[in-house]
Amino acid sequence: MMKNLTLEHIAAACHGTYYGSEEKKSQCIEAVTTDSRKVERGCLFVPIVGARADGHKFIDQVMKQGALATLSERPLGEVDFPYIQVESSLQAVKDLAAYYLEQLQIPVVGITGSVGKTSTKEMIAAVLEQKFQVLKTLGNFNNELGLPLTVFRLREEDEIAVLEMGISDFGEMHRLASIAQPNTCVITNIGTCHLENLGDRDGVLKAKTEVFDHLKPDATVILNGDDDKLVTVKEVQGRRPIYFGLNEEFPLYADEIESKGLKGIACRIHTPKGTFSVVV
């Protein structure tokens, strides 16, 4: 069950107007969905207006299926269920995700980069799962709708969130990172993806590092020191980032790298707290 997220809280977080009975205003939702085919009893339905479909046409259907309430960008008139009218469903779902994550007060590892985000997310989550209850991004739910939906999967028992953030244009990272507000930020590399919007690799660097504007105080920043663009980042929040790579001058580096074929890649990892061998 989601933690203490009442319809009253939702209306305030979304800057929306609540319509419905006072009794239901204090009820907590069980989940949030944008997919009318995946409605759960007690959930909040968020109708997204897309290029090919308008989620508003499914509102009556999902309410009959047991949804507790719905958002709506337009007045619904006299209806027998509670709803919250908002200016934009997409903006509302982002605002609500930021509010919900803030209420949970759990550490967030935010991961971005041109390539390798998903593999890095999986490895970080696998390590953390040895000791903590971890929620991680599933599939490619790393954009302005996918990230909020990932956040809504968090439950009270979760101890750490590992969130992937993918972008294709300037400003997107600002919007994603304002939701995630990472305690730890990892950037894998600066490549040549989305140059149609970002221009060149310097543009990619600028867009990716928008994340720095939304880090929690005293956040840890971990960068690929072998990347010629990321190594130019000398300071974040007044502190030097932690670099990793193949250079033994970095605090975290790998050597003795050897392919084991289908069994993976063997290497030796050097850290400030010791050296160990792994097969990935």
Predicted regions and their residues:
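Residue-level signature of catalytic and energy-coupling elements of molecular machines
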Residues: 10, 62, 147, 188, ...
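Thr-Gly-centered strand-to-loop micro-motif
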Residues: 34-35, 47-49, 72, 136-138, ...
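Adenine nucleotide phosphate-binding catalytic loops in nucleotide-utilizing enzymes
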Residues: 201-202, 235, 239-280
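Structural signal for conserved beta-strand scaffold positions within catalytic alpha/beta enzyme cores
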Residues: 20, 47, 72, 85-86, ...
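Phosphate-binding loop of NTP-binding sites
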Residues: 11-12, 92-225, 229-239
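N-terminal leader/targeting and accessory segments in enzymes
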Residues: 1-95
